[in-house]
């Protein structure tokens, strides 16, 4: 280093005073540096850049494809959701209709059962009325027979006469019962 300083001190010109600049290299250095740079640039331009462009294009296509697939899946999911909502609304409507039909059918069954119960009640009442009328007729006939017999016995006892004649006996009984029939409706 001391030698360099000595050389600089004995030189005719200082380093900045000569035409060569420290910041700007000489022309031959620029030319010889430019040639390898151009060779490297051409190699990159012809070999590396197309491969790089191909990789970028492929990646861009994959990304676009992924986005398109995602959009398609999203559209499909949205369509499925709309379909599901439509089916759900349809099922709710159908359930409401079924409930309404069940209510109507229940009311109809209730009305039918009431009608059947009324018919059965009327039939039982009518049957009871018929039985009551039949029993009444039977009781009236038995009472007529007994009253007829009792009236004959009473008449024989009162008259002291025996009513042996069937025609006389039946005429007397019929008159007595006719008198009772005319008295009974008025006495009710």
Curated annotation (Swiss-Prot):
Task: Indicate whether Cell membrane appears among the record's keywords.
Answer: yes
Gene name linked to the record: atpF
Record protein name field: ATP synthase subunit b
- The signal sequence is none
Transmembrane ranges, per UniProt, are: 30-50
Tell me its family: Belongs to the ATPase B chain family.
Could you tell me which Pfam families the record lists for this protein?
A: ATP-synt_B
Quaternary structure and partners: F-type ATPases have 2 components, F(1) - the catalytic core - and F(0) - the membrane proton channel. F(1) has five subunits: alpha(3), beta(3), gamma(1), delta(1), epsilon(1). F(0) has three main subunits: a(1), b(2) and c(10-14). The alpha and beta chains form an alternating ring which encloses part of the gamma chain. F(1) is attached to F(0) by a central stalk formed by the gamma and epsilon chains, while a peripheral stalk is formed by the delta and b chains.
Report whether Ion transport shows up as a keyword of the record.
yes
Q: Which UniProt keywords apply?
A: ATP synthesis, Cell membrane, CF(0), Hydrogen ion transport, Ion transport, Membrane, Transmembrane, Transmembrane helix, Transport
Q: What is its main location?
A: membrane
Task: Identify the GO cellular component terms for this protein.
Answer: plasma membrane; proton-transporting ATP synthase complex
Query: Highest taxon of the source?
Result: Bacteria
According to its UniProt record, where is this protein located? Answer: Cell membrane
Q: Which InterPro entries match?
A: ATP_synth_B-like_membr_sf, ATP_synth_b/b'su_bac/chlpt, ATP_synth_F0_bsu_bac, ATP_synthase_B_chain
